[in-house]
Structure formats: C-alpha cells, structure tokens
Design a protein with these regions (language model features):
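Structured alpha/beta reader/binder surfaces that contact nucleic acids or chromatin modification marks
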Residues: 1-139
Length: 139
C-alpha cells in the first residue's frame, strides 16, 4: 500500500470525521488513484507556525473555524499511521478549489472516504509516496 506523510495538524484534519480537510496540497502531481495510507509526520513546525499565525490574527477565519475540533494541537499523534483515504483525483489548483479554506496547490490531491485507525500505529515516515508493509483491515 502507498503511504503519504503529512505534517500535523493537516494529517489529523484529513482523517477527521466530520470532514475537515478534503484536499492535500503538494508541489507535485501523481498518477496514483485509490487507497492511500496517511502518516502523521514527527515535525511540529506547522503547529508552531499556525500558532504564531493565530496569535498574529493572520490565519483565515474559515480555516481557523475548521480546525477547532482538532484542538489542542499539542495532543495530535506524531510519527504514526492514522488510517487510509481514497485518492480520487489530482489537479492543478484552479477556481474549482476557491471555496476550500485549505486548498492552495500547486497540485490539489482530492481525498475521500477517510477510514481512521482506532489506535494510531507508530511508523517511520518518508518523503514522497512510499510503500508500507502495514496491513490495514477495513472495519
């Protein structure tokens, strides 16, 4: 199974129910479609940057409101497999994505059907898409 490492809080936002983040932004496109495991990276750089933006009032109100269910960010899992999603499309950013508070491209990976593990599993992440040996059984 292919896996993608995503920094927190974005990894948890992708896996959240109800849905928070349906588009993952990447600098590159992929021909892959289908099941994709989501790994939460170990870095807290985005959490720290987001906290600074929140304190400065620089974050978009829609994005902040959407992230509220994930608080507190410091308790989000790091360095773990969170579950699987279905990668249904990969498109360059366009007007189609303007209403999504998190979509900014340059490539928008459209994700559906998040299926979160009951308990996150420690796993070493990598850059890009990578194969994992973890076997995920859908409930």
């Amino acid at each position: 199974m292919l896996c993608l490492t995503v920094c927190q809080p974005w990894a948890s936002a992708i896996m959240a129910k109800p849905r928070i983040k349906v588009v993952e932004n990447r600098d590159w496109s992929t021909p892959h479609r289908g099941v994709l495991a989501i790994h939460a990276g170990k870095s807290t750089k985005w959490i720290k940057a987001l906290r600074a933006e929140m304190a400065a009032g620089a974050c978009g109100e829609r994005a902040l409101a959407a992230l509220e269910p994930l608080e507190p960010f410091e308790e989000l899992p790091l360095g773990m497999l969170l579950g699987v999603v279905e990668l249904v499309d990969c498109k360059p950013y366009s007007a189609e994505f303007e209403d999504d508070p998190f979509a900014c491209g340059p490539f928008c990976w459209v994700l559906e059907n998040p299926n979160r593990l009951a308990t996150p599993v420690p796993y070493r992440g990598q850059q890009g898409l990578f194969e994992i040996t973890f076997k995920y059984n859908s409930p």
